[in-house]
Amino acid sequence: MAFPQRFSDLPEYAFPRLRTLLDSHAPGAEPIVMTIGEPQHAFPDWVPGVIADNAAGFGKYPPNDGTPELQAAIAGWVQRRYGVAVDAGTQIMPLNGTREGLFNACIALCPEEKNGKQPVVLTPNPFYQVYAVAALAVGAEPVFVPATDATGNLPDYASLSEDVLTRVAVTYICSPANPQGAVASAEYWADLIGLAERYDFQIFSDECYSEIYRDTAPTGALEMVNKLGADPERVVLFNSLSKRSNLAGLRSGIAVGGPKSIARLKQLRAYAGAPLPGPLQAVAARAWSDEDHVTANRALYQEKFAIADDILGGVQGYRPPEAGFFLWLPVDDAETATMKLWREVGVRVLPGHYLAREVNGVTPGAGHIRVAMVAEKNDMAAGLIKLRDCLY
């Protein structure tokens, strides 16, 4: 039997790869897991009641485009958060998790050719792995652009050659960045949107960590498109309740963009999508409408930022994250450091290069480990102290 080759060169996914590295070795102490970005804070206490009140919806097919209540809740959040008025019926699509949207947007919106050539999809490097798979799925060439200390931990897309830029169809950007915690400034967004206008490509803006920050809410792509008066089709915004509301298991994400782009996403969903079940759409509608639990959740992370700064502030090369809940810590060799932490003190982290691709012999992240600050704060502090004392 013949199988397609388009995904044959994909490296092993980060977490199975980590298990291969560590699981044959006993931890040096009671394990403290700081690998996956799965929030451990409590989700809102009203969630079970909303599911129960809407349980009859499990017997019905859910609407592909989302209930009117969910669409209105998302539009209201976009207006409050970014000051941008969007049409709930034509500019919003609820997603069954943001990863679905980030993947399907490339299928729905990336053209087969750009200027008569194979299209290019740009992605930061390191990056959320779905970006590259989406590019391969549509026959585009993924181009991995370093996002390192030298570039402010965001990709410098303008530095690419004219040959590459004229073929760009889609650009992925993550702000706040996973894994580095860097935030795109208004100036960065303006430059990127200007580049997109000049070379006629779309920006897929992954902003799933936008509600976890220190002091100032990160600027968003949709907000800047509106301020600049750019083409509203230029950007598709993606966000989620996973981090904002500690509802990773709900699988509720959103795509917000121009009517033409959203119409194409909806058309694909009608043929091949899996909408969120009705009772879960009811939970999502309430979550997008409520900011009290988000503010309380952010305060917990702000405490964690302060704890991390206190414990690691004396470590050479430590850079406090601007937002998100990952630490991106410098080490000599990521796998060696990861193994040392596990075998000596039972702290489990992720080698940075597991989230990156090698380009011209260089793999961004090879000198870093990613540490998730998702555990209860005392457990997190204990893990960071062990990490500091073991590695530094």
List where the protein language model places each region:
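Glycine-rich loop-to-alpha-helix module at the N-terminal edge of alpha/beta enzyme cores
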Residues: 34, 58-60, 73-76
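PLP-dependent class I/II
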Residues: 1-11, 21-54, 69, 79-392
